[in-house]
C-alpha cells in the first residue's frame, strides 16, 4: 500500500507507470511521485527553475527513451531526465492530446488539430497531418509498435490506420510519412492494450482477442 504516509503528494492518482529500471511513477493532481519501494520523491512545478513541469495536474507518464520520460500535464508535455531528476524540455499542447511512445523513444501525439511526431534531430514535435480523427478515448485506441509505427483504431469501426516514418532522427524535410487504412476486425473495436509485440483488444460484443503483430 502506498499513500500519504509514504509521502504521496495527493490521494487522487490519475496515472501510474513503471519505468525501464523498475521505479514506480504516480501522476496526481499535485505533481509527480517516484516510489522506489522505500522512499517517495515528489516533483512539482517550480517557476524559479528555467525548466519545470508545465502544470501539477499529471495526465500520463510514459517512457521517452532509455534515459527520459514523457510527462503529460494539463498544459503541455514535459521531457523529464531520469538521471538528472529534472525537466529538460517543455512542449505546449492545449486541449485534449494523447502521447504514445515505445521504449526506443519513437513518439507520436494525437490532438484535435493534428498528428505530431517527435523529431530527435530538431528535438521538437512536428505536425505531419491535420487530424480527421475524433481524439476522444485515443489513450486506449492507439499504440506505437517496436519499429516506431503508430497504429490507430478509430471509434465505432473495425478499421486500423497505420502511420509510419522513414526516420525520426533526420531533418524534417527528409522525413516521409506513409499512411494506410485497412479493415482489421469484423466488428467495432472498443479498447486495446499493447505490450511486447502483442496487443489485446475488446470488440463491441465484449469479446477479447489477442494479436501478435510480428
Where in this protein do the model-derived segments appear?
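Carboxylate-rich, polar loop motifs that coordinate divalent cations or form catalytic acidic clusters
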Residues: 1-214
Amino acid at each position: 500500500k502506498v499513500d500519504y504516509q509514504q509521502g504521496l503528494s495527493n490521494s487522487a492518482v490519475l496515472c501510474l507507470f513503471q519505468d525501464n529500471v523498475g521505479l514506480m511513477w504516480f501522476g496526481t493532481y499535485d505533481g509527480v511521485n517516484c516510489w522506489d519501494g522505500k522512499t517517495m520523491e515528489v516533483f512539482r512545478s517550480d517557476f524559479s527553475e528555467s525548466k519545470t513541469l508545465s502544470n501539477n495536474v499529471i495526465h500520463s507518464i510514459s517512457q521517452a527513451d532509455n534515459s527520459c520520460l514523457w510527462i503529460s500535464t494539463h498544459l503541455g508535455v514535459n521531457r523529464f531526465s531520469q538521471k538528472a531528476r529534472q525537466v529538460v524540455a517543455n512542449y505546449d499542447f492545449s486541449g485534449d492530446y494523447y502521447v504514445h511512445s515505445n521504449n526506443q523513444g519513437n513518439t507520436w501525439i494525437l490532438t484535435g488539430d493534428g498528428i505530431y511526431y517527435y523529431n530527435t534531430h530538431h528535438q521538437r514535435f512536428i505536425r505531419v497531418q491535420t487530424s480527421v480523427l475524433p481524439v476522444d478515448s485515443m489513450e486506449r485506441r492507439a499504440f506505437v509498435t517496436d519499429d516506431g509505427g503508430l497504429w490507430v483504431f478509430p471509434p465505432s469501426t473495425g478499421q486500423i490506420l497505420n502511420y509510419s516514418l522513414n526516420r525520426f532522427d533526420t531533418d524534417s524535410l527528409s522525413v516521409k510519412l506513409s499512411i494506410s487504412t485497412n479493415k482489421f476486425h469484423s466488428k467495432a473495436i472498443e479498447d486495446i492494450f499493447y505490450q511486447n509485440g502483442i496487443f489485446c483488444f475488446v470488440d463491441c460484443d465484449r469479446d477479447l482477442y489477442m494479436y501478435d503483430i510480428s
